[in-house]
Regions:
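Charge-rich, low-complexity N-terminal segments
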Residues: 1-137
Length: 137
């Protein structure tokens, strides 16, 4: 089994808010991240797939196809977007880095053909990242 990781970057803004909590509870729980005007991050996304080497191509996965899938499913949808308002997954889900990794997994996993999605890693900044391995990995 081989593991191959492709990296991409995108910028997005968001804020943390739980509509089931009072304004005071939201401010206490989320602090300055509860500002409805949002704040932004330059995210780094690492997508790792796993599989065997194709004897014909010598690849685990078609790198061009993986790049195009990441671009179509993630970057086109999330780059320079206000996640809370412009990305459907976050209409009812708080756009934490944890939830962002899950949403990206859910977008990418069904699109994988020759290799299986193994891990989604999302860096919010240089010293904070989340790894998600999916429900069945």
């Amino acid at each position: 089994m081989l593991y191959l990781t492709r990296k991409a970057e995108f910028a997005a803004s968001h804020y943390y808010h739980n509509p089931e909590l009072s304004p005071e509870e939201n401010r206490r729980l989320f602090g300055k991240c509860n500002n409805p005007n949002g704040h932004g991050h330059n995210y780094v996304l690492e997508v790792t797939v796993k599989g065997e080497i194709d004897p014909c191509s010598g690849f685990v996965v078609d790198l061009k196809q993986l790049k195009e899938t990441m671009h179509r499913e993630v970057l086109d949808a999330m780059d320079h977007r206000f996640l809370n308002k412009e990305v459907p997954e976050f209409a009812t889900r708080i756009p934490t880095t944890e939830n962002l990794a899950i949403a990206i997994w859910q977008r990418l996993a069904p699109k994988m053909t020759n290799a299986k999605l193994h891990q989604v890693r999302v860096y919010e900044n240089h010293d904070l990242f989340v790894d998600f391995y999916g429900e069945s990995s």
